[in-house]
Amino acid sequence: MTNNVALVAGARGIVGSQLVKTLLHRGWEVIGLSRNASSHPQNIPLVTVDLLDAKHTARALQPLSKVTHIFYSAWINAENWTEMVEPNVTMLRNLVCHTAMISSLKTVSLIQGYKVYGAHLGPFKTPARESDPGVAGAEFNAAQLAWLSDYQRGRAWHWNAIRPGVVGSALSGNTMNLALSIALYASLCKSLNLPLRFPGSEQTWRSIVDYTEAGLLAEATVWAATSSAAENQAFNVNNGDVWRWSELWPLIARWFGLECAPPVRLSFQQMFKDYQPAWRELARRHRLVETDILQVNDGQFADFVFSWDYDMFGDGSKLRRAGFWRMQATDDMFFTLFKQFRAARIIP
């Protein structure tokens, strides 16, 4: 056991859920935060809190004086990028300010992404590096870090910012799970005797993307939270390799025993809606755990990823130079996730 006590905001998400597992495995005490009262799959204590409400946050956090580390992977959506800034900065500010006042806080780990490099706006400089200049315009990840780094100045605790690529996870029911969307699509294609057609444009087919396995991301995040080399630093965290879809997609098709077909723009959201009856029959026939495909994954994030008709990757060497060495072959990551989906009877 360690004396470290983690407070995880976003503990049920694609990043937070794996982070909880990793922390528990390392002997940490872990407390989760949630807007709604419910249980957590890992049976950790959950504190129900509305981080947008400063007074409610102060009351809810009052008993948590033993917290040593905050891991922040929560976020709230809005109509556009501009409207996402204020609520997301407010949530982080309320959590950090109140926790810092009542505890012996050591580190705040902020999960970000490549949006800080302008990845959401269109083609951007690749490989993206942590030293790249900021991008003009409203973006909540950058605004959060600007507030956090300013607030931390002169205080005894430290921050770090973690920037993964597309995260690979076995978590079901999360819209951000690209591997799961692909697995559902491939399962439908197999049942309908269709090839696995690439669902993006020719430009997307040729673009370079990097990925981050959820376990590697969790380990890197814990390393950064406990390493002096990571104090007040941002790190890109990726598997350590890069792929073009034109290389990776045929391997995925082969894993499912399917022919690979040329690119045609397809919407996963629309496809999953159209094939709800087909999935119900497939789930019944193979005794899958969920008969409603939209409850497994809605395809929204997959549509976002396959709309990228430009390169999307970062330089992960700063993390390795600082002392975190683990790497992961991305093709093996996908194959392992597909096996896990199958073992859990999410796909046939």
Model region roles, listed by residue range:
Residues 155, 167-185, 215, 223-235, ...:
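Glycine/proline-rich active-site loop of Rossmann-fold NAD(P)-dependent oxidoreductases
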